[in-house]
Regions:
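Structural signature of tandem alpha-helical TPR/SEL1-like repeats
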Residues: 65-70, 98-107, 132-144, 149, ...
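Residue-level recognition of tetratricopeptide repeat
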Residues: 57, 93, 127, 188, ...
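Structural marker of alpha-solenoid helical repeat scaffolds
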Residues: 44, 78-80, 114, 148, ...
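Helix-start (N-cap) detector for alpha-helical repeat units in TPR-like alpha-solenoids
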Residues: 49, 82-85, 119-120, 153, ...
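Canonical tetratricopeptide repeat
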Residues: 54, 86-90, 124, 158, ...
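N-terminal leader/linker segments that initiate helical-solenoid repeat arrays
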Residues: 18-90, 97, 327, 331-338
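Terminal, low-structured helical/coil segments at or just beyond the last alpha-helical repeat
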Residues: 34, 40, 177, 278, ...
Length: 338
C-alpha cells in the first residue's frame, strides 16, 4: 500500500514537471527581448488568451514593457486563440518603439501569416522596408494596406502599382481608422520618382483621414517644395510646426524653402532652432553649394569654422568643395575669354 502511495506521488510529480515543461515550451522566446522571463512575474499562468492579453494591456499601461511583451507572447500559445494577428501587431509595435527592427519585422510578418489583411502590420512593414532602402517592397506593402482598408470599407480592393492616379485616389473610401502612414508613405515614394500629382493626392487623402498628422503635413510641404511651389510648401510645413514646433524634418524643410527663396539669413535663423550655430552655418553653406551658389556658401562655411575651428571638420570639407567649384568656374571663364 505504501509502495502504491509513493508511486502515485512520484507519478503526480512527473506529470507536474511535464506540464511545467510543456507550458514553458509554449512561450515563443524568439519574439521576446528583455529581462529574463523568470524575473517578470510570480503570478499563476493565465488560463485564457483574453486573460493573457488583459495582463499585457495592464503591464503596458504601467510602463512595464517587458512584462507586457511576455504576456502578449504567452497569449499566442492558446490552441484556440482568435486574436493572434492583432497581438502580433502589438508585439511588433513594442519592438519598433525599442528600435528592435528585426524582431518588429518578424512579428509583423507573423501577424500577416495569421491574417494577410492586417492593415496595421502591412502599413508598418511598408515603412520598415522603405526606410531600409527596399522601396519596391515597401511600396507593395503600402498598396496591400490600402487594399485591405478598401475591403474593410467595402470599397474596391483592386489597387495596383499600375492603376494609381490622382483621379483613382479620390475614389478610395476611408474613415478615421484608415492607414494614414500608408497613404503618406506611398505618396513620398511617388514624389521620389517625380510624380508629384499622384503623391499630393495620396498625402492629401492621408490628411483627410487625420488633418493634424505631422508627417503627412511635412511630406505634403516637401512635395510642393520639389515642385518649386514655395508658398504652398511653406504653408503646410508651418502647419506641421504649429502642431509640433520641435519637428526636425519640418524645421529643415522650412530652412530649405527660405534658401530656395534667396533668404539665407532667414534659413540660418530657422536651422538654429534645433542645432548649434556652427552646424546651422554649415547647413546654409552646404545647401547653397547644392543650389549652385558656392560663392555665397563660402562666407557661411568660414564663419562655421571660425566658431568652432577644432571641431568643425565637415565645414572645412564643404569649404574646400565650394572653393574648388569657384576656381573651376574661374578657369573655365578664362579659357572661354581666350
Amino acid at each position: 500500500m505504501l509502495w502504491i502511495k509513493k508511486y502515485v506521488i512520484i507519478s503526480l510529480l512527473v506529470l507536474t514537471a511535464c506540464a511545467t515543461n510543456e507550458q514553458a515550451s509554449d512561450f515563443d522566446s524568439s519574439l521576446y527581448s528583455g529581462k529574463p522571463v523568470e524575473s517578470l512575474t510570480n503570478d499563476e499562468p493565465p488560463k485564457t488568451e483574453e486573460e493573457a492579453i488583459s495582463r499585457g494591456d495592464i503591464a503596458l499601461t504601467n510602463k512595464n514593457v517587458d512584462l507586457a511583451l511576455y504576456e502578449y507572447i504567452r497569449s499566442l500559445s492558446f490552441p484556440n486563440a482568435v486574436h493572434k494577428d492583432k497581438t502580433l501587431y502589438t508585439v511588433g509595435r513594442i519592438h519598433l518603439a525599442r528600435e528592435n527592427y528585426e524582431l518588429a519585422d518578424k512579428a509583423f510578418r507573423a501577424s500577416l501569416a495569421e491574417n494577410p489583411d492586417n492593415i496595421g502590420s502591412l502599413q508598418e512593414l511598408g515603412t520598415l522596408y522603405t526606410k531600409r532602402g527596399e522601396k519596391d517592397v515597401g511600396k507593395s506593402y503600402y498598396i496591400r494596406a490600402l487594399n485591405a482598408d478598401q475591403i474593410r470599407m467595402k470599397g474596391n480592393p483592386n489597387i495596383t502599382n499600375d492603376n494609381i492616379t490622382a483621379e483613382t485616389v479620390a475614389t478610395y473610401r476611408y474613415d478615421d481608422k484608415s492607414p494614414v502612414a500608408a497613404y503618406s508613405g506611398l505618396g513620398v515614394l511617388y514624389d521620389v520618382r517625380g510624380d508629384h500629382g499622384v503623391a499630393q493626392a495620396l498625402i492629401r487623402k492621408g490628411l483627410d483621414i487625420d488633418p493634424r498628422n505631422v508627417n503627412a503635413l511635412v511630406s505634403l510641404g516637401y512635395s510642393y517644395y520639389m515642385e518649386k511651389e514655395y508658398s504652398k510648401a511653406a504653408h503646410f510645413t508651418q502647419a506641421a510646426l504649429s502642431i509640433k514646433p520641435s519637428d526636425e524634418r519640418a524645421i529643415n524643410n522650412l530652412g530649405l524653402i527660405a534658401l530656395a527663396k534667396d533668404q539665407p539669413r532667414q534659413a540660418l535663423s530657422i536651422f538654429s532652432r534645433h542645432m548649434t550655430e556652427p552646424e546651422a552655418l554649415n547647413n546654409v553653406g552646404y545647401f547653397l553649394i547644392l543650389q549652385g551658389k558656392p560663392d555665397e556658401a563660402i562666407p557661411y562655411l568660414q564663419q562655421a569654422i571660425d566658431k568652432n575651428p577644432a571641431y568643425y571638420e565637415l565645414a572645412n570639407k564643404n569649404l574646400e568643395r565650394a572653393l574648388a567649384i569657384v576656381r573651376e568656374r574661374q578657369d573655365t571663364s578664362s579659357v572661354v575669354l581666350q
